[in-house]
Amino acid sequence: GVQTCALPILTFLFSIYFLFKSYQQAQASGYLFYSFLFIGAGSILFPQLTFFSVLWLFEAHRFQSLTFRSFCGALIGWTMPYWMLFGHAFFYDQMELFYHPFKELATFGDIFNLQILQPWELATLGYLLVLFIVSAAHCVVAGFEDKIRTRAYLQFLIDVTLFLFVLIVLQPSQCSNLLPLLMISNSILIGHLFVLTNNKTSNIFFIVATVCLILLFGFNVWTLLRSE
């Protein structure tokens, strides 16, 4: 249900929070432990979150928080929810519960088969892609105006958003699960653009983006009603 869908999103947000906290920390093991603990917990319900653990390690390296000790902390954090799941599954003789996330992770749908996406999903993806290109370009061009830490965080969000777009193209069947995560990272980038720019071009783009958002909302509602 809605709660099951919301849990991976919450774990995703908490994981990002602790990853950000690890920025240039000499003792980052605890932060990376919690960051990967949430990724691991979320991946039990949505196994594709596991893919982000690879990106997280790369970003931790860029944040200068990845050492052998913090890597071990991350590894322990990610495996802990699975040890708990294994204990539950073994005790109640329901080992299929433990195997399920790994089977889901290994099961790929039709790669690049975007035809399976609903019209509202394609429209939403197109809208988010345009916003991403504009906001990412602004971050790259005007990045010198931000603090070094802020630039690192924004680059992380660009990487995550790009990673999500690639995942959706590779696994279109997971689009409905990946879209909320895409909206989170994209909304922060576009918010950064609108807050820090105040000229005629950005104002026009803001108005156009808002009008398109209203039209997109109307289209999504119309599509939903039509399908019923």
Kindly give the residue locations of the regions a language model identified.
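Juxtamembrane membrane-water interface segments that cap and precede transmembrane helices
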Residues: 99-122, 135-139
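Membrane-lumen/periplasm interface segments of specific transmembrane helices
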Residues: 71-106
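Membrane-interface helix-loop-helix junctions at transmembrane boundaries of multi-pass membrane enzymes
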Residues: 136-160
